[in-house]
UniProtKB/Swiss-Prot annotation:
Belongs to the HisA/HisF family. Pfam families: His_biosynth. NCBIfam families: 1-(5-phosphoribosyl)-5-[(5-phosphoribosylamino)methylideneamino]imidazole-4-carboxamide isomerase. Keywords: Amino-acid biosynthesis, Cytoplasm, Histidine biosynthesis, Isomerase. It is an enzyme of class 5 (isomerase). It comes from Nautilia profundicola (strain ATCC BAA-1463 / DSM 18972 / AmH). This is 1-(5-phosphoribosyl)-5-[(5-phosphoribosylamino)methylideneamino] imidazole-4-carboxamide isomerase. GO terms for biological process: L-histidine biosynthetic process; L-tryptophan biosynthetic process. Its EC number is 5.3.1.16. It catalyses: 1-(5-phospho-beta-D-ribosyl)-5-[(5-phospho-beta-D-ribosylamino)methylideneamino]imidazole-4-carboxamide = 5-[(5-phospho-1-deoxy-D-ribulos-1-ylimino)methylamino]-1-(5-phospho-beta-D-ribosyl)imidazole-4-carboxamide.
């Protein structure tokens, strides 16, 4: 199981949102690359980055900070937020990003995303509100069930699916493990669990269910999880 510490970027700062609401942003660092270095020192191998401004704008908005993180660490990076076309994918790969997360475009055009996954290291981000897929920075809900979307990627070459229950995200109320397993069963792909991780109990649940990875955000920033210990135990 892979532990993915998370950095969400808004206006060049590292923040966390509650339930995906931009006006709920709480700033945790003005120098996100320093946070990334700390994660690396703790033993992380991967970093999960979301360009929040990019997710709402539909194009990259925090490139400078992303470049700084890339230059200052040897972490493997998966990145999402505002990646809607092939040019953006190429641009980020040229920067040295290891995996790109496609969300809104993956919901709107599974055929295109499956074609892109033949050429590039792609993860699909499935973000759900009440079981339905949310897009465009979680601003809108598509009339498609998350599990039905996951099933569309069953035969694709995507590397994994990042499954987020938005109602849990940033709430520290515990992971919705049933939702994660539903996505895993529907897609038959490796799944990264996201949204609501509150304690090391959640991480144990992920491990027990043979889930590929888990994203840790607010639980670390608010001191609910000893990240160094979790990384050591799951190395």
């Amino acid at each position: 199981m892979i532990i993915f510490p998370a950095i969400d970027l808004k206006d060049g700062q590292a923040v966390r949102l509650t339930k995906g609401l931009m006006d709920s942003a709480k700033v945790y660092s003005n120098e996100p690359y320093e946070l990334a270095k700390r994660f690396e020192e703790m033993g992380a191998e991967w970093l999960h980055i979301v360009d929040l401004n990019g997710a709402f704008a539909g194009e990259p908005k925090n490139i400078e900070q992303i470049e700084k993180i890339r230059k200052n660490t040897n972490l493997k990076i998966q990145l999402g937020g505002g990646i809607r076309d092939e040019d953006t994918i190429k641009r980020y790969l040229d920067l040295g990003i290891n995996r790109l997360i496609l969300g809104s475009i993956a919901a709107k055009n599974p055929k295109l995303v499956s074609e892109l996954a033949e050429k590039y290291p792609i993860a699909v981000g499935i973000d759900a509100k009440d079981g339905f897929v949310a897009i465009d920075g979680w601003d809108k809900t598509e009339g498609i069930l998350a599990k039905d979307l996951a099933e569309k990627y069953k035969d694709s070459k995507i590397e994994c699916i990042i499954a987020t229950d938005i109602s849990k995200d940033g709430t520290l109320t515990g992971l919705n493990i049933d939702f994660i397993l539903e996505i895993q069963n529907a897609s038959q792909k490796p799944v990264i669990a996201s949204g609501g991780v509150a304690s090391e109990e959640d991480i144990k649940k992920v491990k027990e269910n043979n889930i590929y990875g888990v994203i840790i955000g607010k639980a670390f920033y608010e001191g609910k999880i000893d990240l160094q210990n979790v990384l050591r135990e799951n190395a």
